[in-house]
């Protein structure tokens, strides 16, 4: 995904349009081989988490929901944030 200045309203709407486009591409798994699919999914999730880190507060974030359900360990998210 390209880089966006998410502080700007126009950039946020462009970001979400790009996000929706990537979801549509990911939904067509038969058009992609497994490696490309996993790479695109990884890039999509990385960018989504980066967005949430800056703009989503409280218990609404995907990271908080995954942690609550035991699908994401706290140590893995702490390590990931330190690496960025």
UniProtKB/Swiss-Prot annotation:
InterPro entries xref list: C-protein
GO biological process: viral DNA genome packaging
Functional description taken from the UniProt entry: C protein is one of the proteins involved in the production and packaging of viral single-stranded DNA.
Name of the protein: C protein
Species the sequence originates in: Escherichia phage G4 (Bacteriophage G4)
